[in-house]
């Protein structure tokens, strides 16, 4: 749970609606949980980037399966994900995407 704590601190209230650290942990680890993780309005692209970064930390054996299940949990279409997940680090990111990418870089380095 320790490695998810900075993500929870940074993203809950910004990219995700309010949720406890325990429920956040359960959702991210695909455990059954009555409180579903919900993306805030206009944050789906940044969540796609976060999913990408998190999936890169997983072994190849689990990466695709976890990504597919978390996309389904968050109601993100795979084609949308594939077209948007790199936007925060594209050649011309928006200011908010650029800020988010820098915050995530400090967490994931």
Regions found by a protein language model. Give the residues of each.
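Flexible coil/loop and intrinsically disordered linker positions at secondary-structure junctions
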Residues: 1-109
């Amino acid at each position: 749970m320790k490695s998810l704590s900075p993500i929870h601190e940074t993203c809950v209230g910004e990219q995700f609606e309010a949720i406890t650290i325990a429920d956040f942990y359960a959702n991210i680890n695909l455990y059954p949980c009555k409180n579903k993780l919900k993306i805030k309005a206009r944050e789906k692209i940044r969540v796609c980037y976060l999913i990408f970064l998190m999936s890169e930390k997983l072994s190849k054996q689990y990466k695709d399966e976890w990504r597919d299940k978390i996309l389904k949990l968050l109601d993100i279409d795979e084609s949308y994900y594939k077209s948007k997940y790199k936007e925060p680090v594209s050649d011309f990111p928006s200011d908010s995407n650029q800020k988010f990418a820098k915050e995530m870089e400090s967490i994931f380095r």
